[in-house]
Design a protein with these regions (language model features):
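NAD(P)H dinucleotide-binding glycine-rich loop of Rossmann-like/cofactor-binding domains
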Residues: 72-79, 89-155, 300
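Mid-domain Rossmann-like dinucleotide-binding core that forms the NAD(H)/NADP(H) cofactor-binding site
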Residues: 125-203
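Short amphipathic alpha-helix with an adjacent loop that forms part of the alpha/beta core around
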Residues: 204-214
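C-terminal hydrophobic helical "lid"/dimerization subdomain
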Residues: 2-4, 282-335
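Glycine-rich phosphate-binding loop and adjacent beta-alpha segment
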Residues: 227-301, 334-335
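N-terminal Rossmann-like NAD(P) cofactor-binding module of classical short-chain dehydrogenase/reductase
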Residues: 95, 152, 198, 220-221
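Glycine-rich beta-strand-centered segment in the early N-terminal region that forms part
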Residues: 31-48, 56-100
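Short, glycine/polar-rich helix-capping loops at beta-to-alpha or helix-loop-helix junctions
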Residues: 102, 180-188, 257-263
Length: 335
């Protein structure tokens, strides 16, 4: 019997600036058998996230960096094809840190089962996965929006931003999205129900904020950092809340990360700025998933997945995150 081959992308070097194909090495290994308490998963879909850029850095963070020569970390969903673990049986579908490869073999730490009969598998990487959990807890627990308030979201056409904006609408807020390009801004309003949009590629963000938020910004959900964060800080309302969810404009800097110049706006407006790491909310994922599932089933929230086929396309597909090409959740289908 011919041994099965596991294609893998390994971290070959730590990138300076944008990662490229040389950041990763490609390997093919034989698929092994699970030892005691291990499972073997055939990966079907992988989640491509801005956080992956941070995992490549040799720096202290909320989880250890990926080691040189290790399989590139990625969340994903797949099917258990062999198991020596009491909680997982052959045929189960699971969500976990599967890595950029055809098969995961190891202990299923943090893995949980998903049901493809209830929702398509890619949805468990978007609205029903870490993306949805991030949007849910960052907005509701940290941002604490109230009906009638103005919520501004950067990276609004991306995976987290598009869902966060829709949740804010459900809470009775006026929602303004910041995105790059007329097509994305149109999608925010026509498909996701945002009240307004600012095209940072083709207009001055400060002027757009003045137009769309005449009374100021009560909640700012920041996914990009940099100059856009600075622009929003100048428009904060009294007691505003700034949620730091990401800073994609800064992830590939070769120089030091740029800090906000207008931070004194927090002082004069009695506002607060708070960072958010989704894993802090892991004990509450079930409650959020239940509510998100209800919103999706009723059509109150729409989830958009940008699915690219082919494990071999991983290095190029990952770069779509940083060029702004993707619309919604970027997912890699393992062929």
């Amino acid at each position: 019997m011919t041994a099965q081959i596991n294609r893998q992308f390994l971290l070959a070097r730590r990138p300076q600036g944008l990662p490229d194909r040389e950041t990763f090495s490609y390997a093919e290994t034989a698929v092994g058998e699970p030892a005691e308490s291990e499972i073997l998963v055939r990966n079907e879909y992988l989640s491509l996230d801005p956080a992956m850029r941070g995992w490549m850095n040799d720096a202290k963070s909320y989880i250890p960096p990926v080691g040189i020569g290790e399989v590139m970390r990625a969340l994903g969903v797949g099917k258990v094809v062999a198991s020596r673990h009491a909680d997982f049986a052959v045929g189960d579908y699971v969500n976990g840190a599967l890595g950029v490869q055809d098969y995961f073999l190891g202990k299923p730490k943090g893995f949980y089962k998903v049901d493809p009969s209830r929702a398509p598998l890619p949805l468990y990487l978007s609205a029903l996965g870490m993306t949805g959990m991030t949007a849910y807890f960052a907005l509701l627990d940290v941002g604490q929006p109230k009906a009638g308030e103005t919520v501004v979201i950067s990276g609004a056409a991306g995976a987290v931003g598009s869902i966060a904006g829709q949740i804010a609408k459900l809470k009775g807020c006026r929602v303004v999205g910041i995105a790059g390009g007329a097509a994305k801004c149109k999608t925010l309003i026509d498909e996701f129900g945002f009240d307004g949009a600012i095209d940072y590629k083709n207009e001055d963000v400060s002027a757009g904020l003045k137009r769309e938020c005449p009374k100021g910004v009560d909640v700012y959900f920041d996914n990009v950092g940099g100059d856009i964060l600075d622009a929003v800080l100048t428009r904060l309302a009294h007691k505003a809340r700034v949620v730091l969810c990401g800073a994609i404009s800064q992830y590939n800097n070769k120089q030091a990360v740029k800090g906000p110049a207008n931070y004194l706006s927090l002082l004069v407006n009695s506002a607060r700025m708070e960072g958010m790491v989704v894993m802090s909310y892991a004990p509450r994922f079930a409650e959020a998933a239940q509510e998100m599932g209800g919103w999706l089933a009723s059509g109150k929230i729409k989830s958009k997945e940008d699915i690219v086929e082919g494990l071999q396309t991983f290095p190029e597909t990952l770069l779509k995150l940083f060029s702004g090409e993707n619309l919604g959740k970027l997912v890699l289908k393992v062929d």
